[in-house]
Amino acid sequence: MANNKSAKKRILITKRNNLQNRFYKSSVRTLTKRFLSDLETYKISQSNTDKDKLQNGLSSIYSLIDKGYKKNVYHKNTAARKKSKLAALLKAA
């Protein structure tokens, strides 16, 4: 266990950051899975409502990825790669 004040503080900060990192990564994974299932539905139906749903889903994923990058959960290139892959999937649909 930590013996001095700064080490104890670092333990608390590490726990806080770990929770924050898990929240962002889990949320991005969940929204991505939802986006991919909506994408499959759109490929079958080709309706405008599904297209709007995809656009909204993509923007919310982008927002979370950008916030995660801003809080050092994701590296800049990792965030860009995730966003680029999702955009390419939507464009191909």
From Swiss-Prot:
Pfam families linked: Ribosomal_S20p
One GO BP annotation of this record: translation
Molecular function GO labels: small ribosomal subunit rRNA binding; structural constituent of ribosome
Location of this chain's protein in the cell: Plastid, Chloroplast
A GO CC annotation given for this chain: small ribosomal subunit
SUPFAM superfamilies for this protein: Ribosomal protein S20 (SSF46992)
This protein's UniProt keywords: Chloroplast, Plastid, Ribonucleoprotein, Ribosomal protein, RNA-binding, rRNA-binding
Family matches, as InterPro entries: Ribosomal_bS20, Ribosomal_bS20_sf
Family under the similarity heading: Belongs to the bacterial ribosomal protein bS20 family.
HAMAP family (UniProt xref): Ribosomal_bS20
Protein's job: Binds directly to 16S ribosomal RNA.
Protein name from the UniProt record: Small ribosomal subunit protein bS20c
Record organism: Thalassiosira pseudonana (Marine diatom)
